[in-house]
């Protein structure tokens, strides 16, 4: 028998969204940015390709400096990761011994639980109300690490800011605020770093910066926390190409601010259209919406959309089994989605 750790063998693996092998799908299932980055970011790529026999910068210096300019902090307060999932892993490995507690909401990004369990942590799930919101601050004094996403998937709304701040104030361990979707809203929590020395902000370039295929993310915190997390980081955790493109993309803030505004405009149109089509739809601060059709089972809608080459995300979790999650695409992609829904609704 293989000597597999019990905490691994008993942990269900993370289930990613479907990645079709053909290009004839309208892909609204994995919250990717529908708009590509500017062509100019690729201009320096050929020179970097000639250096692939050499290791990349082990600490991603230029990338961190570019991020520091955007975040308005020192690059020494930033750790670069192979996507923000890397930052989540590093945080558990840095702060949580086997058997110690990791806390997170009962409905949130499912990778938190997977990461915590495979590291042998104990789990505390914080209950949310019937609107999938916090009932108050997270009070969990035994938690060495609290994961909290704002905006919080799969609903996509920001959590109550006062509750989050009180969570940071009350926590005896570290609070990691996952801001994967924050650029599609008007609010962030970087100011918490000035008030609390136990806070980490994680960011990704997969959603707002159109680099999901490159895997670039950041952890932002005090220099003390960053120094400790850096000890745990895998050596050369970002390849040369990811560092180059990530650095280049961050220099195009005006372009991406326009993209984010377009996504928000399309999001508003989609929410209004779905409500007209008899969906219950949550307001969203993200690049996706969570919607429940009132005239068909959500699982059947998912299947019938897929038959029409439109992919959305369906979760079998009991609390959201009546919902589908729809990523915000281009206006043309959303038109195709709505046409397909009209067709399905007309046949039911």
Curated annotation (Swiss-Prot):
The modification N6-(pyridoxal phosphate)lysine is found at residue 207. It catalyses: L-histidinol phosphate + 2-oxoglutarate = 3-(imidazol-4-yl)-2-oxopropyl phosphate + L-glutamate. The keyword Thylakoid does not apply. GO terms for biological process: L-histidine biosynthetic process. The keyword Amino-acid biosynthesis applies. One of its GO terms (molecular function) is histidinol-phosphate transaminase activity. It comes from the Bacteria. Its EC number is 2.6.1.9. Coiled coil: none annotated. Pathway: Amino-acid biosynthesis; L-histidine biosynthesis; L-histidine from 5-phospho-alpha-D-ribose 1-diphosphate: step 7/9. Transmembrane segments: none annotated. Pfam families: Aminotran_1_2. Keywords: Amino-acid biosynthesis, Aminotransferase, Histidine biosynthesis, Pyridoxal phosphate, Transferase. Its cofactor is pyridoxal 5'-phosphate. InterPro entries: Aminotrans_II_pyridoxalP_BS (IPR001917), Aminotransferase_I/II_large (IPR004839), HisP_aminotrans (IPR005861), PyrdxlP-dep_Trfase (IPR015424), PyrdxlP-dep_Trfase_major (IPR015421), PyrdxlP-dep_Trfase_small (IPR015422). Belongs to the class-II pyridoxal-phosphate-dependent aminotransferase family. Histidinol-phosphate aminotransferase subfamily. Homodimer. PANTHER family: HISTIDINOL-PHOSPHATE AMINOTRANSFERASE (PTHR42885:SF2), HISTIDINOL-PHOSPHATE AMINOTRANSFERASE-RELATED (PTHR42885). This is Histidinol-phosphate aminotransferase. The gene is hisC.
